[in-house]
């Protein structure tokens, strides 16, 4: 699990205008909440935050918010729909040893059996793990699985200390038969002429 240090500064101005000014200055407005504390408004450096958020379920260590550092997980990230830059982030305060529920990507390994195609129903699985030990992904070995096989959430091999936080009967992927190629118009005309 990666942990990234980011310098945060308290926000004193609120509203749309203040948020726009912060973004123009290269900052991203954020809200810090959790553990029964009142929500706190902060600004984070935009570039550093963008790089950190490229890692799924990254644990951020905020410096400059309190007298001590805060460990947080990004819960909600809002991006500009056109340009893609960060507009706002909600951060959940966590503590070492605390278990949190997060979505972890499924990493497919291997090739399915002959004539089969892997149908990915879910790209992520919801798990409960210690905040400082969230896996970066869960490997799913599909090597040689025959057509008609379903892989459920309960079939996933989870790392030590990680529990499934979703229904174990949920199908996450299945192996289906390859679709027969459709005949082209030229082939159909050729068959009709014979």
Swiss-Prot record:
Q: Which GO cellular component terms are attached?
A: cytosolic large ribosomal subunit
Q: Which InterPro entries match?
A: Rbsml_bL25/Gln-tRNA_synth_N, Ribosomal_bL25/Gln-tRNA_synth, Ribosomal_bL25_b-dom, Ribosomal_bL25_C, Ribosomal_bL25_long, Ribosomal_L25_dom, Ribosomal_uL5_bac-type
Give the keywords, sorted: Ribonucleoprotein, Ribosomal protein, RNA-binding, rRNA-binding
One Pfam family this chain carries? Answer: Ribosomal_L25p
Which GO MF terms does the UniProt record name? 5S rRNA binding; structural constituent of ribosome
Please name the GO terms of the biological process aspect recorded for this protein, alphabetically: translation
Alphabetical list of HAMAP family matching this protein? Ribosomal_bL25_CTC
Subunit-structure text: Part of the 50S ribosomal subunit; part of the 5S rRNA/L5/L18/L25 subcomplex. Contacts the 5S rRNA. Binds to the 5S rRNA independently of L5 and L18.
Q: What does this protein do?
A: This is one of the proteins that binds to the 5S RNA in the ribosome where it forms part of the central protuberance.
State the family named in the UniProt similarity comment for this chain: Belongs to the bacterial ribosomal protein bL25 family. CTC subfamily.
Name by which UniProt lists this protein: Large ribosomal subunit protein bL25
What is the organism of origin for this protein? Thermobifida fusca (strain YX)
């Amino acid at each position: 699990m990666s942990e990234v240090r980011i310098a945060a500064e308290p926000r004193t101005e609120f509203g749309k205008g203040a948020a726009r000014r912060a973004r123009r200055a290269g900052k991203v407005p954020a809200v810090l909440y959790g553990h029964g504390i009142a929500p706190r408004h902060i600004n984070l450096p935009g570039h550093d935050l963008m790089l950190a958020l490229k890692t799924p379920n990254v644990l951020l260590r905020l410096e400059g918010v309190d007298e001590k550092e805060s460990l947080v997980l990004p819960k909600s990230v809002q991006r500009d729909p056109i340009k893609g830059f960060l507009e706002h982030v909600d951060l959940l305060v966590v503590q070492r040893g605390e278990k949190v529920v997060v979505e972890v990507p499924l990493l497919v390994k291997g090739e399915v059996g002959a004539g089969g195609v892997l149908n990915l129903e879910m790209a992520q699985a919801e798990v409960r793990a210690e905040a400082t030990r969230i896996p970066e992904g869960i490997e799913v070995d599909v090597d040689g699985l025959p057509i008609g096989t379903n892989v459920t959430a309960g079939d996933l091999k989870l790392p030590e200390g990680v529990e499934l936080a979703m229904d174990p009967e949920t199908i996450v992927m299945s192996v289906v038969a390859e679709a027969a190629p459709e005949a082209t118009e030229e082939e159909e005309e050729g068959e009709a002429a014979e």
